[in-house]
């Protein structure tokens, strides 16, 4: 069997996974399901990293993606749905999607929350209907150790991102290339 044929099988599987993850309407959750998932995710995040509660209280808005599925083998994709919370109330629904190519293999599920600390960052999200991470307002990724040393007087950036509930077999985690788009629910 030629090298081209041997490589075609995994490539076809990866392409099928990419299309399924990013384009499957059956994956779309209802507004009520998203709200329940966001409530549970925030409670879990605040319990595991208590400093995020203070960060959320100071934020102009918090965009929470409770469950993002990422899969890949050479080609990869990720998709998740979430809600924007302003003063504790849902102000809109968004999805996040990304595609990638490179040396990668595995499946991972995770969530993340974006804390919008300035009016301009929140307005950028709502006026643009979404944005591609890496363009627009600056984003600082906090891990649980950094968050513990964090105080409300040290928040000087537009957006802080905190990852949570990471499960799976994929190494590395990044926001580069992720596109966030507004959804109608």
Residue ranges and their predicted role:
Residues 2-13:
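Bacterial N-terminal signal peptides that target proteins for export
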Residues 28-185:
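Small-residue-enriched, tightly packed secondary-structure blocks
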Residues 22-28:
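Sec/Tat signal peptide C-region and signal peptidase I cleavage site
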Residues 12-22:
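Bacterial N-terminal signal peptides
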């Amino acid at each position: 069997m030629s090298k081209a044929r041997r490589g075609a099988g995994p490539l076809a599987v990866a392409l099928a996974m990419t299309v399924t993850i990013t384009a499957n309407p059956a994956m779309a959750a209802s507004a009520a399901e998203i709200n329940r998932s966001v409530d549970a995710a925030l409670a879990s995040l605040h319990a595991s990293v208590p400093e995020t509660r203070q960060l959320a209280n100071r934020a102009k808005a918090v965009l929470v993606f409770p469950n993002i599925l990422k899969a890949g083998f050479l080609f990869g994709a990720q998709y998740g749905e979430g809600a924007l919370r302003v003063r504790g109330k849902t102000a809109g629904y968004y999805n996040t999607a990304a595609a990638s190519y490179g040396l990668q293999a595995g499946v991972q599920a995770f969530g993340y929350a974006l804390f919008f600390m300035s009016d301009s960052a929140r307005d950028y999200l709502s006026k643009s209907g979404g944005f591609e991470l890496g363009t627009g307002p600056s984003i600082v990724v906090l891990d649980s150790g950094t968050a513990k040393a964090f105080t409300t007087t040290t928040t000087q950036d537009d957006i802080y991102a905190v990852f949570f509930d990471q499960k799976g077999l994929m190494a590395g985690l990044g926001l580069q290339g992720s596109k966030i788009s507004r959804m109608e629910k």
